[in-house]
């Protein structure tokens, strides 16, 4: 046998030993029935699920002729897939999908245990306390304070209260003598107004720790969208407000207890848990009870990465110019997980992240597929970093182009609900018409970002703008004889109201419907078509429980290749006419 040259990449080194050897190859097998060379548009509508039609289903209410035509025009080329729970690696069927795990599944073509599940396993087994990350922060327990910063909620999208409770218990049992919690109120992944109950629950837990001799209390707080939890460097002032309260112990609002703080701040007209201003807890002398100082340990306990990265940079980077930190305490900092594998950020973490290798993007680049990916700032990371298995940057800059359109800053998205949908559509259209790319991949964020505001009218406008962007892309595909695949990452805009078990809208004490600002458990559509789609291609009917992870094999087929053997099964079949 001839010995072939070694192929090296960042995951492994493989020696080709000829036929019959069980080595892993990047080379994809040609599909027996589907041609190569067609331009494929992959469109992800963020927060676009399928639900019963009523006035709180903004997708149904909106004028969306393009998406409507995909649903009704070709029944064998439109179906629903699961985008929540175990289908995307989350622990239970009650776990809403989110954009991170959704894009991981779409890009990876396989289901990986995700953040929350990894943390659950580490806490349940106690392995979290044996890991390098915990041992790193544990060295501060004797003389310093352990600070825990994160979202106080049981929403399960960024964090979970029960995980914080277990971490508090475990840390105190492993030597933490002084603990300060810096809480961020939710109102986005859970109902607005629930912050008071979560704070009361936490205060009760901390009181129990104090009875056991641990000096434990809440030190600061604020609403998640106004304090700390910005993402993609959209607005560093959000992080600075958190830094001032958490590290410097400074905020415009000072209270003697967190329950008092949240109750008082919610009395302001139109107050919302998401946007509560920063506050610090002070003692009887007016001194902050828990600023972060030299010798302390800090843990950010969110398991989801995107809204922790900016704070992680502020806590970890010696050279930092995004705002004046005033002082940079010498601390030991660990994330619940590593939030960015490429930046190695943070450098210490309590639970190792899912190792996602051999994503569809990497396979396609190895097979010469020229790729264009685009979204606006708020979802750019999803169509690149998360799609590529939590990996920053291109696999091959010669074959890939990633374009980020700056998102609006300084406003909530219901003020400009069209966002940058048309600009994304234009960029995708131009990329398709240029002939330079084989795959054009976009995320259109409107349904999710505006849906999160709870503004029903604005969300309708958002869905209409998204539909127009899809039309621009599909028109370009028509022009070049290409193929489209349109899907979504999870639900949101299709159900904007909290419901009882029989599906009726829930009312508050004043008789108003309770608006739902979170994601949903609804399935999402997948539609295929275009003049380049080979005759006889249709969705299979033997995969009723198909999920987002099945989509990767599907578009790999549309490029004219068989998917890797370990990928979730393709959604399509080719029937001989």
Description of each model-found segment:
Residues 10-577:
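Feature captures the catalytic ectodomains and active-site-proximal regions of enzymes
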